Regions:
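Transmembrane alpha-helices and adjacent helix-loop boundaries
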Residues: 1-227
């Protein structure tokens, strides 16, 4: 085990942390907004909305994330009308394609988490809101979503961890995040074991921080709720 190489490589690999966190943050924010919309469509009585959400979730969850990334970054470029449209300004950028892929992925998984949280809301709470004269939108904002967040947070925390690990795939499209830098170092040093141990340790540290944050958020939500 070449510890000096591991030490030197650590300071190079951590330079990929900002890009990794940028991708995770943007994908999570956009994905969460999209997930709420998809979840609302999924529980809607409108068959068109419900079916669209169902097939969106089924397609994203049923196909490999790497395949989705290849389709968006390489596949869409094969269509002339896309290359000649304003979309090409965005789709030729590997960072945009990586964020878009992860956004769609986390939206599909998070939508099911949110849907489960919505369906766990006891009918009595909704009936109480109706009896107080709350509109449907007000009940959603004041009753359904707060309870949904509390119920869905543990599972959503796991989704965040999966998102961090999934960012390693975007190195395939030449982005120099943690794994991308690690692969570059390996190509020069031919020491995959040492370098991947360092990269894996960095991922572990990031996910440890996320786990502790989620645990704290769970405590605050449960501590402030009426038991």
């Amino acid at each position: 085990m070449r510890f000096e190489l591991m030490y030197d490589s650590f300071f190079k690999i951590i330079q990929g942390i900002p890009l990794t966190l940028e991708v995770v943050l943007l994908s999570t924010i956009f994905g969460l907004f999209l997930a709420v919309g998809v979840a609302l469509m999924r529980v809607s009585n409108n068959k068109i909305f419900s079916n669209f959400a169902y097939y969106f979730i089924y397609t994203i969850r049923g196909t490999p994330l790497l395949l989705q990334l290849f389709f968006i970054y390489y596949g869409l470029a094969q269509f002339t009308f896309i290359r000649e449209s304003f979309l090409w300004f965005f789709l030729e950028d590997p960072l945009f394609c990586g964020i878009l892929t992860l956004t769609l992925s986390t939206a599909a998984y998070s939508a099911e988490i949110i849907r489960g949280g919505m369906q766990s809301v006891a009918p009595g709470y909704i009936e109480a809101g109706s009896s107080m004269g709350m509109s449907k939108m007000l009940r959603l904002r004041k009753i359904i979503l707060p309870i949904t967040i509390r119920q869905a947070l543990p599972a959503y925390g796991n989704e965040l961890i999966l998102m961090v690990k999934a960012t390693s795939l975007i190195s395939i499209v030449t982005l120099m995040e943690i794994t991308g830098i690690a692969r570059t170092i390996i190509s020069k040093t031919y020491a995959p074991v040492e370098i991947f141990i360092v990269a894996g340790s960095i991922y572990l540290l990031i996910n440890f921080i996320i786990t502790r944050f989620i645990k704290y958020a769970e405590y605050r939500l449960n501590h402030g709720s009426i038991q």
